[in-house]
Amino acid sequence: IKFEKKEKLNDIIKSLPFNLTNAQSRALNEVIDDMVSENMMNRLVQGDVGSGKTIVAVLVLALSVLNGYQGALMAPTEILARQHYESLTQTLAPFDINIDLLVGSLTKKQKEKVLEKIKNHETDILIGTHALIEDNVEFDNLGVVVTDEQHRFGVRQRAKLSTKGNNPDILVMTATPIPR
């Protein structure tokens, strides 16, 4: 997928209640460069807890939506998925970006509603746990897959989420240093 840089992304960045750090800006620019290239992105963002990896992911997901695609963010626990949901909703709601949460504790009826919305592209960004890789989760037009705490998922689990789109760009985040 070849994305285009969108001016509206700058509006989202300007609306943040803080300025991006130099490291966040550099990471974001590198990821965006990957996204606008002809090649599929498969990138790791590594940083300490609290270093701002999540805001980079939020902006990457927003760029996907601004280009007409959907985004997915998979977290290893329901608590973390809910935190991401609240963070993304707070940041992106003023920009008419629809975000839904898919986790194990939803009722059957709630899950069915979310699944229908994601399939019909009424949901722009879906956040959840392993529930995202269930067979019944069908995206209309998945452009970016973000996996938080990637070391908590198996290789097959991460790969399965990316098969729900047509070669979506992949961003994985970790606070755990990767041994060389």
PLM feature segments, named:
Residues 24, 49, 77, 127, ...:
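Conserved hydrophobic/aromatic pocket- or pore-lining residues that grip, position, or stack substrates
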Residues 46, 128, 146-147:
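Hydrophobic residues in beta-strands of the RecA-like P-loop NTPase core, especially within AAA+ ATPase
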Residues 68-72, 98, 121-125, 141-144, ...:
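Loop/turn-to-beta-strand initiation segments
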Residues 70-77, 102:
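Conserved RecA-like ASCE P-loop NTPase motor core of nucleic-acid helicases/translocases
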Residues 80-117:
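Conserved helix-turn-beta segment of the N-terminal RecA-like "Helicase ATP-binding" lobe
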Residues 82-85, 139-180:
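Post-DEXD/H (motif II) to motif III coupling segment of the RecA-like Helicase ATP-binding lobe
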Residues 105-126, 133-142:
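Conserved motor-coupling elements within RecA-like helicase/translocase cores
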